A protein has these predicted regions:
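Short hydrophobic targeting helices and cationic amphipathic motifs
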Residues: 5-7, 11, 24-25, 34
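PRPP-dependent phosphoribosyltransferase catalytic core
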Residues: 38-49, 172-245
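Active-site-facing substrate-recognition patch
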Residues: 38-99
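Short glycine-rich phosphate-binding loop at a beta-alpha junction
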Residues: 102-110, 185
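Short, glycine/charge-rich flexible loops or terminal/linker lids adjacent to PRPP-binding catalytic cores
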Residues: 117-155, 163-169
Length: 245
């Protein structure tokens, strides 16, 4: 697991190496570490291991939207397993640190993204805020909780991307308050075409630790699903709104 030394003084990143120079009392201290890149398969394996993701084509789940789905994702479960929690936190930090090095602060999406955003901000030593789905109906009526200054570059942390609608609404709230949205990182994405189109239209780069294709491939390798079930799972992803099982 890498150790982060955060400095605006000097920073170089490439595929597998990070070099950071920290200036302290006229002396330069240089740190090196080497690591593998974000492992989508390893993240998917851990989510399956703790049943954070369940696959059941025979008895589909019903989402809040009314969609029938052969998959259910509950990334909140990872918070209850310390070693997996640390792994996911570090992977989030790696993505943010490498892909969005200019971010001034992080913003968590309420509610599931709040914990992950706070943990990543703590490890990266960045300021942190979180965004509610709507303004509070009492007190100060805040929709964004925490201190921020307009013009700052903010990275949004989310746990799950389905259609992307609610996640992008958060980006809109941040932009309306004068913040620059650098991008969004999520633990898992279903990879729906509608989500890809929405993020592209909004001009918000999206990164995820793992995705639907990786998950299905891994489930097939492990014998969790068979070839017939794989076809069902892939067909659902093509047209989830009209899929009936």
């Amino acid at each position: 697991m890498p150790v982060f030394f955060y400095s605006r003084g000097y920073l170089i990143t490439n595929k597998n190496r990070l070099i950071t120079k920290v200036y302290f009392q006229n002396h330069t201290i240089q740190f090196y570490y080497f690591r593998a890149m974000t492992n989508e398969k390893a993240v998917a394996e851990k989510l399956l291991q703790i049943n954070a993701i369940r696959l059941n084509p025979q008895q589909p789940f019903t989402w809040a939207s009314g969609w029938k789905s052969p998959i259910y994702c509950d990334n909140r479960k990872t918070l209850s397993f310390p070693y997996i929690r640390d792994f996911v936190k570090s992977e989030l930090c790696n993505v943010i640190f490498e892909s969005f090095p200019d971010a001034d602060m992080l913003a968590g999406v309420a509610t599931a993204g709040i914990a992950w955003g706070a943990m990543a901000a703590d490890q990266l030593k960045l300021p942190y805020i979180y965004v509610r789905p709507k303004p509070k109906e009492h007190g100060l009526g805040n929709q964004i909780e925490g201190y921020f200054e307009p013009g700052k570059r903010v990275m949004v942390v989310e746990d799950l991307i389905s259609t992307g609608k609610s996640s992008l609404q958060v980006c809109g709230v941040l932009k309306d308050q004068g913040l620059q949205v650098e991008g969004m990182v999520a633990i898992f994405t279903y990879g729906f075409d509608v989500a890809a189109a929405a993020f592209a239209e909004a001009g918000v780069p999206l990164k995820s630790l793992t995705n639907y294709e990786t998950l299905i491939t891994l489930a097939l390798e492990k014998g969790i699903v068979g070839p017939a079930e794989e076809e069902t799972l892939l067909n659902w992803r093509k047209d989830p709104a009209n899929w009936k099982g």
